[in-house]
Amino acid sequence: SSAASDVYKRQISTQANNTNYMTYKFWYEHGAKRVVSARELSLAEISEIRANIPDDMEIESFVHGAMCISYSGRCLLSNYFTGRDANHGACTHPCRWKYSIVEETRPGEYMTVNEDDRGTYIFNSKDLCMIEYVPEMVAAGIDSLKIEGRMKTALYVATVARTYRKAIDDYFESEEKYRSNMEYYKSEIAKCTYRQFTTGFYFGKTDSDSQIYDSNTYVKNYTYIGTVRQVTDDGCVCFEQKNKFSVGECVEAMDFNGDNIECTVEAIYDEDGALMESAPCLLYTSPSPRDGLLSR
């Protein structure tokens, strides 16, 4: 209904194969106000779309995260192998798994195509990272930057989203400020699990450098250990633990206001107030800074 359209803005997924301005116009004529561009588009092609669609139509484009190996994300591997549908936001990333080649008349005989002793990574794309190119994305006429976050932790989502938010705000305040803070942006993103980075298709066709051939693992510099749920009157926090940690370890708290605070775990108490040396995945209270996410 028209009333519903006024309340809920219709947005079209990247999986609708939105690769040219005629597609955008089609969706606009059917009530869509925002369309997510296909990952295969370059910034030049997005600029062309922007120049040929209504001014009040919004373009959303991916700025960071895993790159789907399938065209416009339309992949059935996850659904076929695990019953979890990528087209409904539940992709299990089978493109990251190891694969071997078997000739159908020789079952059990694996071809020697391995890059290492664990398999060959024929679908293993690097992760997209456009933190250095926010001005170019703005200049292309993109209205919203999309961060891919499937199967990611709260720490990943919070850190990456906060970093790009700061980068965008810094750029609109001053390009000089944005450039001067680049190492900070990169260091924050490096705290999350990630693969090697690429700029995807934004500057033209990809080449062999956009793939990872020797590993299927993530780079992991920090461990997400928990989420602060409550701050007590005596300066402690009650938090939900995600990974084990111990008294004496140095941890970093990511505050909601954007600050990172390093501190040492002085003590850990269980729900009954008993002291513990380490925390094996329950609810705990510990002296710590304000609300936020904890990592080490």
Regions found by a protein language model. Give the residues of each.
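Catalytic beta/alpha-barrel core
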Residues: 5, 11-19, 33-41
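Surface-exposed amphipathic alpha-helical tracts and adjacent flexible/coil segments at the periphery
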Residues: 25-286, 290, 296
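Conserved small/polar residues in nucleotide/adenosyl-binding loops
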Residues: 2-11, 284-291
